């Protein structure tokens, strides 16, 4: 009788060698809503100009655990007045095991933010709506394309520097 090999062999002594990624928790790390021009801003007839900025950061939070933070800054202005300003840091803890080191940056800076963004978008929209402004629906973002664009820019910059300079 031949011995069967399979999933049991990969679990020697309780260890699994297959890549594993799991979202452990997601949370609002920081949230600020400012309405500095109230109450006069509510009488302004024009629509505010909206400026949205994003930033993504990641750091190791423990063994096989990484925190990914999506920072969203939204500022609405009407002329010289600030209608509102929202600063949100929405984060997630990801358990990552048996993933090659070269695959971590694409996951942490592209895939993880893609998973967090819908929830961060809702938190920002709720804060704006609760400030008595029309809810702002942020368009989906292709974090993968942004990651690739930034990686290409870094590669081009590195190639443009003469050898020996840092």
Curated annotation (Swiss-Prot):
Superkingdom of source: Bacteria
Source organism (scientific name): Rhizorhabdus wittichii (strain DSM 6014 / CCUG 31198 / JCM 15750 / NBRC 105917 / EY 4224 / RW1)
Protein name: Protein-export protein SecB
Positions of transmembrane segments: none
Record keyword Protein transport present: yes
Cellular location(s): Cytoplasm
Keywords for the protein's UniProt record, in alphabetical order: Chaperone, Cytoplasm, Protein transport, Translocation, Transport
GO cellular component, one term: cytoplasm
Record keyword Chaperone present: yes
Family: Belongs to the SecB family.
GO molecular function: unfolded protein binding
One GO-annotated biological process of the protein: protein transport
Pfam families, sorted: SecB
Subunit structure of this chain's protein: Homotetramer, a dimer of dimers. One homotetramer interacts with 1 SecA dimer.
Coarse class of the protein's main subcellular location: cytoplasm
Job of this protein: One of the proteins required for the normal export of preproteins out of the cell cytoplasm. It is a molecular chaperone that binds to a subset of precursor proteins, maintaining them in a translocation-competent state. It also specifically binds to its receptor SecA.
Taxonomic lineage of the native organism: Bacteria, Pseudomonadati, Pseudomonadota, Alphaproteobacteria, Sphingomonadales
């Amino acid at each position: 009788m031949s011995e069967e090999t399979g999933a049991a062999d990969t679990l020697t002594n309780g260890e699994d060698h297959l890549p594993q990624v799991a979202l452990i928790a997601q949370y609002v790390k920081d949230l600020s809503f400012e309405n500095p021009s109230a109450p006069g801003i509510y009488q302004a007839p024009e629509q505010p100009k909206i400026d949205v900025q994003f930033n993504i950061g990641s750091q190791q939070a423990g063994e096989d655990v990484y925190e990914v933070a999506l920072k969203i800054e939204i500022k609405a202005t009407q002329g010289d007045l600030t209608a509102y300003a929202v600063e949100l840091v929405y984060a997630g803890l990801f358990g990552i095991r048996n993933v090659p080191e070269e695959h971590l940056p694409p996951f942490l800076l592209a895939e993880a933010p893609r998973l967090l963004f819908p929830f961060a978008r809702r938190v920002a929209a709720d804060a704006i709506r609760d400030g008595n402004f029309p809810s702002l629906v942020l368009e989906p973002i292709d974090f993968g394309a942004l990651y690739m664009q930034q990686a290409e820019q870094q590669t081009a910059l590195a190639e443009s520097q003469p050898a020996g300079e840092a």
